[in-house]
Amino acid sequence: MADKRKYTRKYCKFTEAKIEFIDYKDTALLKYCLSERFKIMPRRLTGTSKKYQEMVEKAIKRARQAALIPYIVDRDNVVVNPFEILG
């Protein structure tokens, strides 16, 4: 029989840190929920709970409206750490 894969249990970083509110101006906190092309990462990849995932999505969308985070990145200019561009 095939060996079963052992998965590491993902946990919510926000629940562990006991964060009550996610501010859209805190781009350092939001970068953990964005991919290298500035897409919002799903819960199954980040391990974020439903409550905090909704708060993160709302904060990211507000940060995009305020031009703190770009909507998209050109395919040719994808960087390893996208927050190096933001300063």
Swiss-Prot record:
InterPro entries: Ribosomal_bS18, Ribosomal_bS18_sf
GO molecular function: small ribosomal subunit rRNA binding; structural constituent of ribosome
Gene3D superfamilies hit by this protein: Ribosomal protein S18
Protein origin, superkingdom: Bacteria
Keywords attached to this entry: Ribonucleoprotein, Ribosomal protein, RNA-binding, rRNA-binding
GO terms for cellular component: cytosolic small ribosomal subunit
Coiled coil: none
Keyword RNA-binding: yes
GO biological process: translation
Family named by the database record: Belongs to the bacterial ribosomal protein bS18 family.
Role this protein plays: Binds as a heterodimer with protein bS6 to the central domain of the 16S rRNA, where it helps stabilize the platform of the 30S subunit.
Subunit structure: Part of the 30S ribosomal subunit. Forms a tight heterodimer with protein bS6.
Protein name (database record): Small ribosomal subunit protein bS18
Organism (species): Campylobacter hominis (strain ATCC BAA-381 / DSM 21671 / CCUG 45161 / LMG 19568 / NCTC 13146 / CH001A)
Source lineage: Bacteria, Pseudomonadati, Campylobacterota, Epsilonproteobacteria, Campylobacterales
